[in-house]
């Protein structure tokens, strides 16, 4: 990690940061990669609240950065904030366009499924499988989604 960035992260982690504005002010000179690495480091240091604040600061400064959209989407998923994860991963798909990766589609489908919108999850995976028909990860995700959909349909207590 960039030494100056690491020092800033350590200072932020040691201090009681009062809000997003304080974080943005402290890190406004850093790159999207610095933000991604910083969020990873803060999560590894068991500081999820500051990691979230840093991700939000990164998004406010670089809203179209793949690095920040990826880490922010993953962070939202770990927090089980499915609507935010969906929004961030959809933004990532829009930014990547034809460069979108199978894992991005897998994570987006999973976020939709966890948000209990199985139709959207199937739509994402079906679209991805048209691009990568032999991708084992996507095939496995689709099979898991089919089983989950069947289990949900069979259970009267869902929804």
Per-region residue spans from a language model:
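Alpha-helical segment of the N-proximal tetratricopeptide repeat
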Residues: 28-53
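Short coil turns that delineate tetratricopeptide repeat
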Residues: 63, 97-99, 133
